[in-house]
Amino acid sequence: MCISVAGHHKQKAAINGFTAISWFSRFISFFKLILRPVVVWYNSVMAKYPIFLELDSRRTVVIGGGAVAVRKIQALLNAGARVVVVAERIDDMMTALCRGTDAELIKSKYSKNYLAGALLAIAATNNHELNKQIYKDCQELEVLCNVVDVPELCDFFVPAVVKRGNLQIAIGTEGQCPAYAGHTRKKLEAIFTEQHGEFLAELEKLRKQIIENVTDPADRKTVLGRLADDESFEYFTENGSAQWQTFAAEMIDNLQSARQ
């Protein structure tokens, strides 16, 4: 009898344990469900990936015909993109901007069909419902979308840029305050001059020579690091390109001599 009771208690304990585990599993599942929006929000905030895109001859679409659209079109044309402009009204400024370029002007209401084959699209209309529809269509077609001034409807943000030759510095605020990015750009424009772009062009030439002639990877890294530093730039600005090249050649020779 005692054995039977003990067995009964063990069975009951096992059932209770199973029930506890079951409830715990349900709690964990519920907890994950509650946290999912938080995780999605966290990823949306933290997972921005800065990138410079090669847009040469790639189809891009700008929807809208106002001043903002004009600025976006100009930037895309400067990057070599093949721009398709869709707007119900196309003014003389837009026509003049696109004249002599590969841009295609389509005077029409927006249609999802215009997005076909595009790498990215920019919605620059003053119609919020239309902008939302453009974003939705882009998601379905896997086209990167930027709805101007609506961060939550953006797959990417267009940064403020300081450009000196091929030196480009992009400043972004993830759509939180583009005006602050513009303010920061002005400060950087005062620091980085056209000479920085010229210096970069000389570095590019020399880098090719170093890759061909300096066989040791560690030596290449050392030389390029020294030639790209502030002291080297100051020498370049004070003495000019020809003397800087002599300075660079001596630095390479000294390093290689030290290795022998």
How does the language model describe each region?
Residues 67-68, 129, 175:
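Residue-level detector of alpha-helix initiation sites
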Residues 11-22:
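Positively charged N-terminal leader segments that act as targeting/secretion signals
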Residues 120-124, 131-157:
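ADP-ribose/adenylate-binding Rossmann-like module
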